[in-house]
């Protein structure tokens, strides 16, 4: 998405303010002061503060959808956790790229609907690709729900603690945890539909 200099300044100002306060506590005056722009310049580019937030949320969401759609069907739950799929790595690269915005979006004062939509998107991604590799999946909805929570919470921790791992390193660490959960808990993936589920 192409943005002009004024939009970039407005977005950057919003992101900085969003780190410490909720969207409803951010005013146009604050944005203008931090970006050194006039109110008229703000209104030439955005209808209101919510429009700035929505643009950034949609940008992140569309990038995640693109990454998911480009998935090459390498199994994310392969036991060899040292070889995460390229798109799993790309997901964490995206998280790091939008780290400043996600600091606010995934915080306690962030937009709950953005967190929920991110979780649904991640869960749907996991479900579609698990089913492409396993004939029978026991408790798949619960598995995907828990794993998507874990992945998003891992993203939050990465952002909060300024994790210095590379995108691949982050993907490896998170994948190990997900694989451990899937293979060691009662909620597990079954590769053979004829196996006894008792």
Where do the model's predicted regions map?
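Hydrophobic alpha-helical connector segments
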Residues: 69-100
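Residues in the helix-turn-helix
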Residues: 9, 41-43, 101
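Helix-turn-helix
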Residues: 20-51
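Amphipathic alpha-helical packing segments from all-alpha helical-bundle domains
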Residues: 109-134, 142-149
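Alpha-helical structural segments
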Residues: 8-16, 34, 51-71, 86, ...
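Hydrophobic alpha-helical segments that form the core
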Residues: 138-161, 168-181
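Amphipathic alpha-helical segments used for helix-helix packing
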Residues: 89-119
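Short, amphipathic alpha-helix enriched in basic
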Residues: 5-28
